[in-house]
C-alpha cells in the first residue's frame, strides 16, 4: 500500500510539473 501511495504522489507531481511548464509557456 505504501508503494502505491508513493507512485501516486510521484505521478501527481509529474502532472503538476507538466501543467506548470505548459502554463509557463
From Swiss-Prot:
Keywords: Ribonucleoprotein, Ribosomal protein. The keyword Nucleus does not apply. Transmembrane segments: none annotated. The keyword Nucleotide-binding does not apply. One of its GO terms (cellular component) is ribosome. Belongs to the universal ribosomal protein uL30 family. Part of the 50S ribosomal subunit. This is Large ribosomal subunit protein uL30.
Amino acid at each position: 500500500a505504501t508503494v502505491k501511495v508513493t507512485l501516486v504522489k510521484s505521478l501527481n507531481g509529474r502532472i503538476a510539473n507538466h501543467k506548470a511548464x505548459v502554463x509557463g509557456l
